[in-house]
Structures are given as structure tokens and as C-alpha cells.
Amino acid sequence: MVEPREQFFQDLLSAVDKQMDTVKNDIKDIMKEKTSFMASFENFIERYDTMEKNIQDLQNKYEEMAINLAAVMTDTKIQLGAIIAQLEILMINGTPLPAKKTTIKEATPLPSSNTNNEQSMSTYSSSISGKTSETVKKNPTNAMFFTRSEWASSKEFREKFLTPEIQAILDEQFANKTGIERLHAEGLYMWRTQFSDEQKKMVKEMMKK
């Protein structure tokens, strides 16, 4: 017969063993959860790195596109300014001459009254040929073939090919603009306010050719 004291210790040891088994099982479950969590976390890190790389690639592409777009817009604005300058000259002087490369010094000045394009003038007497004066048409539309920089910045160009009245209007309307931006704004203003329907039709027909 087992004594009460021995029975007590046996029961206590049995209870401790059961509790230890429970703790061991809990530890195993925790380790499994830890392993699963670490796998998920590593997968998350890989996905984050991939996402970060994709974002960086997109940012690089965006910056490259922004640079290309700025270059295209600048070139387009310059070309549009050149077209607007031609429209201004066309409105003031009528149908242009055949294309001819010239400079501002070679261009014929605009008549001060701007009445019509058929006004004549006497040519100078040639010291070589000895020709006498003859009547010729004054057609200053050679200015259409200036370089873009001359269109955008030449004060002499404005004085020669725009009447004082038009210059005054444009100076008042666009005093806060300069360069190509001002040329663009002036051209649009003149197209909308100064061109007749007939002139607009003629310009549109020319642009189709």
C-alpha cells in the first residue's frame, strides 16, 4: 500500500509532466507560426523591393518623357511663332513672293501708309548698267524669310514691317510678354481681330499646299 505522502508526490509529478507536455506543444505551435510569419514577411519584402524598383523605373521614364515633351513643346512653340510671324506679314503686305533667303538688311521696308501692295517707287540709277529710273512694285514680304531669331527679337523688323498704329496696339496688349511668347500672342491677336474673312481663307488655302 502506497503511503499518502508518496501518492501525493506521484500525483504532483504526473501533473507537472502533463503541464510540460502542454507547454512543449504550445512552443511547437508558436515556432510553426513564427516560421510561417517569417516566410510571409520575406515574401512581403521581396514584393516591396520589386514595387520600389518599378516605381523608380516609372519615375525615370516620367522624367525622360517630361524632358522630351519640354523639348517638343519648345520646338513647336518656335515653329508656331514663325508661322504666326508669316501670317502677320501676309496680312500687312498681301501675297508673299517666292521663297528667297534674305537678311533684314536686304528686305525692302514697308510703306508708311500701308495702303496697298501695288504702290510703286522709282529704282535707283545703276552705275554699272546706266539704266534710267523705272517703276517697280514695293513688296517687303521678303521679311517672311528671316530667321526665327530675327522674327522674335528684331526691333528693326517691327519698325520696318508693322505700322505705328499696329505697334502701339500690340505694345499695349502684350507689354508683359517677350520673345517667342510675345510673337505668338501678337500673331493670335492679329489673326483674330485684324484678318478679314477673305484673308483668313487665303491663308488657310496656302497652309494646305
Swiss-Prot record:
Protein location: Host cytoplasm
Keywords of the record: Activation of host autophagy by virus, Coiled coil, Early protein, Host cytoplasm, Host-virus interaction
Chain intervals with Polar residues compositional bias: 110-119
Coiled-coil intervals, chain numbering: 13-75
Chain segments carrying region Disordered: 107-135
Main function: Induces host endoplasmic reticulum stress and consequently activates autophagy and NF-kappa-B signaling pathway. In turn, may induce autophagy-mediated STING1 degradation and innate immune evasion.
Family: Belongs to the asfivirus K205R family.
Protein name per the record: Uncharacterized protein K205R
